[in-house]
Amino acid sequence: VGYLARCQALLSWGRPVMDLALYAGDEVYTHWHGDENAQEGMTGSPVRIPRGYNFDIVNREVMETRAKREGAGLRLPDGAYYRFFADVSASNPVLPTLPRRDVEGPFRSVHRTDGVNDVYFLCGEGDAEVVFDVKAGERSVEIWDALALTRCAAEWSDTADGRTRVRVSLPVDGSAFVVFNGGDDRVEPKAKSVPAAHRYQSLAEPWEVEFAYHPAIKAKPPAKRTWNMLHDSSTEEHQLKFFSGTMTCISHFDYGGENPAEAYLDLGMVHNGVAHVYLNGVDCGLAWCAPWKLDVVRALRRGRNEIVIRITNTWQNRLILDCRLPEAKRVTKSCLHYYDENKENRWTRRCSGYCRGDERVPSGIDGMVVLETVAVPLRPRK
């Protein structure tokens, strides 16, 4: 929730910078679809939006009462300006001639400005390295991470045509804000730093694992287990492979190093769920997305440490198992209808329950839990 609130605050700041305003007619359009390149056009229309261009759809009310034509574009009373306008309601719509943009990598962007400062929100699909050129002038270039709560100077270079080239590395399915700051509250450019000394320690001691269903489920949960790995492939027990609920995993490890500048617990990957981490009784936060890494520097201590990880997955596996059981033996109750055969139609698959042939999905933590300590700070905190 905090991540979403921070993103929405920045995405509500200033005014949007958009490329295209499209009038799609007065018919209620169902949806806009896209391929793996994100922007493809409107269902039933031959319009295809070139990659790298942002667009909004405007209706007749906007065109008649709010929008004003400015050259080839539109301007709205709230300050939003669209450089190009196109009527795509015709049977053979024609877009204005748009310069081709060099867009590389599976990512999307949103641009907002207040006239002095500019904010670009970048989100990737898979691993993505984003490189883009912007006229920054004398402004500083910063990376704001709404997930890690960090703010640091970006890596940039000047191009031959007087623009600023910014390179941003995004984690798997991750995001970042690139801020061109023209105010007094700036982050100083990165100085040449001493190489950080990373140390990695795998937490190899066994885990005591307890299982719990949601309080509404009255069935008895699986008994306590001792595991070396926290992935469900480490067991062949039918009841555990289809478990849906919360696993409380407790282990210990010894740390003999000096007090680090930074310390992270790397969970590798949490399948089909989230992980809440406590170190020595200190709440270190919730890992719910890549890079599945939490800051534990304030909780880590020399000597013996206790770690507790509460892993909660979705109901999917239990629902798949229950559709294979007689109704009297099912743990869950669902308003969805179960099916005996695989469903070929994709809308049926989305809007119905599971079938007996559906495969379970992985759960738990993939790989070893690793403690990463850093002797020199990787980035300034603010």
Where are the predicted features?
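Signal that preferentially marks extracellular ectodomain short beta-strand elements
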Residues: 294-297, 320-321
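Carbohydrate-binding surfaces of carbohydrate-active enzymes
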Residues: 1-246, 254-258, 277, 287, ...
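Aromatic-lined ligand-binding clefts that engage carbohydrates, nucleic acids, or primary amines
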Residues: 133, 253-280, 307-311
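Residue-level detector of short, conserved catalytic/binding motifs and their immediate flanks
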Residues: 18, 118, 263, 275, ...
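Short, well-structured beta-strand segments enriched in hydrophobic/aromatic residues
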Residues: 175-176, 263, 302-328
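Glycine/proline-rich low-complexity spacer/linker segments in large multi-domain proteins
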Residues: 184-205, 313-371
